[in-house]
């Protein structure tokens, strides 16, 4: 007879969902928190690799070409790791398949956010397996909220892939260690994964390649069975055999992933270049005669620029050898200055010490940044206790110390850059979480059994391990606190920000004299603060007091201050100088200078605008760089800009719009046939069929509702294409739509 169906309470029990643990709920909550913080940062961030002349911009441009044509080109300056280019290209290709290449940047950032969030559960399990649940929860929280990791997916697109692969690699090594204790677990598969992930980290940042030596030390530690040595050496032979098997399981996939790239480099350059040439070139730059004698990196770069790409590594290696023979001390001359510069409160440094924010949204996110420095101080000081205690986590101690020492040595030899120190902070955060987790467990013991907790504490503090931890902690704290006069810096910095805020309020209210007074007080506190000088120069620019604007800017340069220099030059009629500053800022700024100039500048009212001549900043946004077209019949030069999908032109007019006014637009298409260009003026949208290869003039009536207004906003939109997809010979991987040379109101 068939069983009866459960009813009532029995039915409810049969449908019960799996029990959700408190740990799972906590991890889910901090993942959501981490996502919210990253979205907050992205919303406030203006930096965009499409406008960058730095690493991210190079990766983006080469990835766009790879996605469009399937052709990989090395950077003209250095042979760089290919990992980021391939990952960027995959996202850009997916955006092309979706029919909207402009989605590419968002998809790249989305993937980086995903990798950043995956660090939270992976980090939890890594720390839990090594040090226990409390350490895992603390480490996961750090992965979610620490400021450098929050800004990483949005700001520094060349690092999230490396950091995720490094963390995943460490987790796989620990999984291999644990699986060796489980019958029929096939632990070698975890080592295969560890080899693949370290190789992928190496193809994102080549220093990871050399950390394979640390992994071999980890395996050597973990394959020792803990027994005593035997006279006949059989136990030693078994240890070596186990280590060799484990090493091969790791090294074979590690080499298999990297080898195709090394072979490609040999085929292209006929040189053994394992991954890149960054390390030797950067070391040579820091040691070169030009830098050593105070002539700067510009001369060193010009020397390399005259040498073929494939010969640069050989040249710098030979010259480093010459320098070491002639002046060995030059290698270590910056060791101590660079070493103490590692141990600084990075957000305080960026916010109050540096001369500019360099477009980073530090002011908008200062609470998170300040919290980040406090967390860094806590986990750094705590980590030395865990790193100095009796090793109980196995070979991970070797791996962590290897990475910390190796990363510190790298920046001591070359230069200190925050992203190069990420492995240091990753492992110090891991061991800081271990120490803080042990403290949390001790506090729980103290609540349950105070005498037992007191005995444990006394035993540890009187042991060599405890004394070593206290000594290292005191030394590190002294190193951090003596590097900067933090109370003075923070106090002065707060006053600077208060004066700046007062100046901003006065400027927004139209009180230019009040704004000038507040900004001058700000600069009296921090004279080298270029961002503040730029704020003051904006006021003088708007007042037409150009000489005072130049004096306010001073000599230090940022891309935003150079944009102001361009505007001041334009106001004084020095057009050639204005073009130089505007176009240089546009190419190298790392943000959309057209958008910024449209927000910041109040250019001269005009009835007609020539696009692409270098003097159109403050009037438009959404266009590519200016280009020269064929001259008019009378020989007059004619410049233009490509619209990049969607853009806007805003014309401040010398007189109000009248009945009968029309907008004159001169445009040409880029792909065969007609390109539909949607032109929106007021509430009216007109679609123009823009013919490819033919410059035509189009006229659109100004809507009646705009009569009497003295500012005209024209919104443009058209489908995009990538020139290199149509003709690989042109090498142009930009997203373009139509060319526009002139806009006028008649």
Language-model segments: which ranges?
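Loop-to-helix entry region of an early transmembrane alpha helix in multi-pass inner-membrane enzymes
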Residues: 82, 86, 97-121, 152, ...
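Transmembrane-helix signature of polytopic, membrane-embedded enzymes
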Residues: 102-106, 118-145, 163-164, 182-186, ...
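Membrane-proximal lumenal/periplasmic loop motifs of glycosylation machinery
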Residues: 44-57, 67-89, 322
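Membrane-interface anchor segments at the N-terminal boundary of transmembrane helices
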Residues: 107, 331-400
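Multi-pass, polyprenyl lipid-linked donor-dependent membrane glycosyltransferases
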Residues: 54, 83-84, 107-115, 138-173, ...
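Membrane-proximal stem/loop segments at transmembrane-domain junctions that anchor or position
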Residues: 266-349
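Membrane-interface transmembrane helices that cradle and orient dolichyl/undecaprenyl
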Residues: 130, 169-191, 201, 219-229, ...
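Transmembrane-helix motifs of polytopic, lipid-linked glycan transferases
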Residues: 107-131, 168, 172, 381-385
């Amino acid at each position: 007879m068939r069983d009866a169906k459960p009813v009532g309470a029995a039915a409810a029990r049969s449908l019960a969902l799996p029990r959700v643990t408190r740990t799972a709920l906590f991890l889910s909550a901090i993942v959501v928190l981490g996502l919210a913080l990253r979205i907050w940062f992205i919303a406030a961030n203006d930096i965009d690799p499409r406008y960058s002349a730095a690493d991210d911009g190079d990766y983006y441009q080469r990835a766009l070409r790879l996605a469009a044509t399937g052709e990989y080109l090395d950077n003209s300056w250095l042979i760089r790791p290919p990992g980021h280019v391939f990952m960027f290209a995959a996202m850009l290709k997916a955006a092309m398949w979706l029919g909207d290449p402009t989605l590419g940047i968002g998809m790249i950032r989305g993937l980086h956010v995903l990798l950043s969030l995956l660090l939270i559960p992976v980090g939890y399990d890594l720390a839990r397996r090594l040090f226990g649940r409390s350490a895992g929860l603390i480490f996961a929280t750090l992965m979610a909220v620490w400021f450098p990791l929050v800004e990483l997916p949005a700001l520094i697109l060349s690092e999230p892939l490396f950091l995720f692969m490094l963390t995943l690699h460490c987790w796989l090594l620990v999984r291999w260690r644990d699986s060796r204790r489980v019958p029929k677990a096939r632990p070698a598969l975890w080592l295969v994964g560890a080899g693949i992930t370290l190789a992928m980290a190496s193809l994102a940042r080549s220093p990871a390649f050399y950390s394979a030596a640390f992994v071999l030390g980890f395996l050597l530690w973990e394959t020792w069975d803990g027994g005593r040595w035997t006279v006949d050496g059989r136990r030693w032979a078994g240890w070596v055999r186990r280590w060799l098997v484990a090493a091969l399981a790791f090294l074979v996939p590690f080499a298999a992933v990297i080898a195709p790239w090394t072979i490609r480099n040999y085929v292209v350059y006929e040189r053994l270049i394992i991954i890149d040439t960054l390390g030797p070139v950067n070391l040579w730059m820091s040691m070169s005669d030009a830098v050593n004698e105070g002539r700067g990196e510009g001369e060193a770069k010009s020397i390399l620029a005259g040498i073929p790409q494939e010969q640069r590594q050989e040249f710098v290696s030979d010259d480093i050898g010459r320098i070491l023979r002639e002046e060995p001390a030059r290698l270590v001359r910056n060791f101590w200055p660079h070493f103490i510069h590692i141990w600084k409160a990075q957000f305080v440094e960026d916010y109050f010490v540096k001369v500019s924010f360099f477009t980073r949204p530090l002011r908008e996110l200062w609470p998170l940044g300040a919290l980040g420095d406090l967390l860094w101080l806590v986990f750094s000081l705590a980590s030395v206790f865990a790193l100095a205690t009796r090793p109980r986590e196995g070979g991970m101690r070797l791996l962590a110390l290897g990475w910390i020492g190796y990363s510190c040595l790298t920046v001591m030899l070359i230069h200190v850059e925050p992203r190069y120190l990420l492995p240091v902070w990753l492992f110090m955060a891991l061991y800081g979480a271990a120490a803080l987790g042990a403290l949390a467990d001790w506090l729980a013991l103290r609540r349950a059994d105070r005498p037992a907790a007191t005995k444990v504490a006394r035993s540890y503090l009187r042991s060599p391990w405890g004394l070593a931890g206290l000594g290292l902690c005191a030394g590190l704290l002294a190193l951090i606190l003596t590097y900067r006069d933090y109370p003075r810096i923070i106090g002065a910095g707060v006053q600077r920000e208060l004066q700046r805020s007062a100046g901003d309020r006065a400027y927004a209210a139209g009180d230019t004299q009040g704004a000038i007074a507040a900004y001058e007080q700000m600069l009296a506190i921090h004279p080298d603060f270029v961002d503040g000088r730029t704020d003051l120069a904006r006021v003088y620019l708007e007042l037409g007091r150009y000489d005072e604007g130049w004096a306010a800017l001073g000599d230090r340069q940022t891309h935003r201050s150079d944009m102001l220099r361009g505007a001041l030059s334009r106001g004084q009629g020095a057009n050639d100088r204005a073009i130089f500053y505007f176009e240089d800022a546009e190419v190298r700024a790392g943000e959309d200078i057209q958008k910024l100039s449209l927000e910041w500048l109040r250019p001269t009212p005009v009835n007609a605008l020539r696009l692409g001549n270098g003097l159109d900043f403050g009037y438009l946004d959404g266009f590519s760089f200016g280009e020269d077209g064929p001259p008019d019949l009378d020989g007059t030069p004619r410049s233009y800009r490509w619209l990049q999908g969607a853009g806007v032109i805003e014309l401040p007019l010398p007189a109000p719009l009248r009945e009968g006014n029309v907008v004159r637009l001169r445009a040409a298409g880029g792909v065969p046939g007609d390109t539909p260009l949607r032109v929106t003026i007021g509430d009216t949208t007109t679609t123009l069929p823009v013919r490819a290869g033919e410059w035509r003039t189009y006229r659109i009536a100004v809507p009646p509702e705009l009569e009497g207004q003295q500012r005209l906003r024209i919104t443009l939109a058209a489908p995009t294409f990538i020139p290199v997809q149509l003709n690989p010979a042109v090498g142009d991987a930009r997203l373009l739509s139509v060319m526009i040379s002139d806009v006028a109101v008649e």
